[in-house]
Regions:
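Membrane-proximal intracellular helices of multi-pass ion channels
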Residues: 1-188
Length: 188
């Protein structure tokens, strides 16, 4: 089950990353596909390795907000752990079939399909840290590393700046120019 979940998420992530890339960034289909597969696996496994010299802080990548959102999702899914993912999948299946579609089981047994306490604590903590980190990154870096981004790009880059240091270590901003408050927030 773990292998199926891992490969499914990584393959979907690789396809989405590949589709988010511009054709001019790589010399040929296979180089682009290798980049997509490598970064999907690296993000889901929370490794943070990149094949690019400056990480994702390269001209063709630091403004690719779709790529950043895909990597954020992979980072979060990989960081949650398999028991949480399985619990979420079971709950989602139950909620979709019973609550939304109204499908009733022919079996007359009661099974409480709820998110476990572990799942709830993990999800609440993960998204709370992500939200607080995004807001603080956005505020402290608005007139610094986020200056070159506009509109929704500032928010996505702040979200990426909050999600990545907790688990993987990808970067889409120049880490050497971060303000002191951002560095302190990132450390803790």
């Amino acid at each position: 089950r773990i292998i199926v979940i891992t490969f499914t998420i990584e393959i979907i992530g690789a396809v989405l990353i590949f589709l988010s890339l511009k054709n001019t960034l790589f010399n040929g289909f296979f180089n682009g596909m290798f980049f997509a597969i490598f970064h999907s696996v690296s993000a889901f496994c929370n490794a943070g390795f990149s094949t690019l010299q400056n990480g994702l802080y390269e001209t063709g990548f630091k403004f690719n907000y779709v790529l950043q959102l895909i990597l954020i999702i992979l980072l979060i899914l990989g960081g949650l752990g398999f028991p949480i993912l399985v619990n979420i999948m079971k709950y989602s299946k139950y909620y979709l079939t019973r609550k939304i579609l109204g499908v009733k089981s022919w079996k007359k047994q009661y099974k409480p399909w709820v998110l476990s306490l572990n799942s709830r604590i993990t999800l609440i903590t993960t998204f709370s840290l992500l939200a607080i980190g995004t807001i603080l990154f956005y505020i402290t870096e608005y007139n610094n590393t986020l200056v070159e981004h506009h509109g929704i790009g500032k928010f996505v880059t702040a979200l990426f700046g909050s999600a990545s240091p907790r688990t993987a270590g990808f970067n889409t901003v120049d880490m050497a120019t971060l303000t002191l408050p951002t560095v302190l927030i990132t450390m803790f």
